[in-house]
Design a protein with these regions (language model features):
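Catalytic machinery of carbohydrate-active enzymes
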Residues: 1-245
Length: 245
């Protein structure tokens, strides 16, 4: 039970799963104690399966959350954070700039360690975890070569549509079913490499600081966190020798 003397700091967040995972280092920097997730006026609402998927991951990180629970005690409101959105900066920096956590024009969040910690799913230890969502694709990215190179170790996570689209386009690989973002995180945490495009699964991989290879959408490279082992492919050229074997 919280002490009555504990300072409570409540965040109102209007964004999607990836936006919220990218926001976690900002949440901690603000010493926040609760996040209230609300449906945005744009895009698919968080109400339903999206919030239901995200909540177990937030719970596992010690982040209390509620959905569409409005209150007068909001300390930080991110509703208009996209005022600071730019295609060429990360979703994390856009949100940090909006809340003046960093300079509003040029600020950058320095991330030097993982911001997510989960128990790895040991059944996937040493596998290459792949996800490809419908948005933010780059036709130059050599997915067929990735499947050829890592096929025996590869496993796909994602929706039925994402999986069917992937295997029809690039060849058969097995699928690992996940029911929520926490299970996605546990799968990625056990992997030797994560490969995917700009999606919530990417933000989980970056939060875990797992070696990764990203299919970068050249027109909006808004999901890049630099760290050793993170490779961002803009032009379709991949040096497989530099990646985990």
């Amino acid at each position: 039970m919280d002490s009555p003397f504990t300072t409570k700091v409540t965040i109102l967040h209007q964004g999607h799963i990836g936006d919220i995972i990218a926001f976690i280092p900002i949440y901690r920097k603000l010493n926040a104690t609760r996040i209230l997730v609300t449906d945005a006026a744009w895009g698919e609402p968080m109400t339903g399966y999206k919030y239901d998927s995200l909540k177990p991951l937030l719970d596992s990180q010690g982040i209390p959350s509620d959905l569409n629970q409005f209150t007068s005690s909001i300390d930080y409101d991110t509703t208009n954070w996209r005022e600071c959105y730019k295609d060429h900066i990360s979703l994390m920096d856009s949100q940090a700039r909006y809340l003046h956590v960093v300079d509003r024009k040029t600020g950058h969040m320095e991330i030097t360690e993982p911001w997510l910690k989960v128990e790895p799913n040991e059944s996937l230890r040493g596998r290459v975890v792949i996800n490809r969502s419908a948005r933010y694709r780059n036709d130059k990215f050599p997915w067929s070569k990735v499947v050829e190179h890592y096929g025996k170790d590869a496993v796909f996570i994602g929706t039925d549509h994402e999986y069917n689209d992937f295997v029809q386009s690039f060849g058969q690989i097995p699928r690992h079913l996940t029911k929520d973002c926490l299970e996605v995180a546990r799968a990625i945490a056990a992997s030797k490499l994560y490969v995917g495009n700009q999606s919530s699964a990417y933000w989980i991989a970056a939060g875990l600081r797992i070696p990764l290879l990203q299919e970068v959408y050249e027109h909006a490279p808004n999901s890049i966190i630099r760290y050793p082992g993170a490779v961002y492919c803009f032009d379709g050229n991949i040096d497989f020798e530099s990646l985990p074997k």
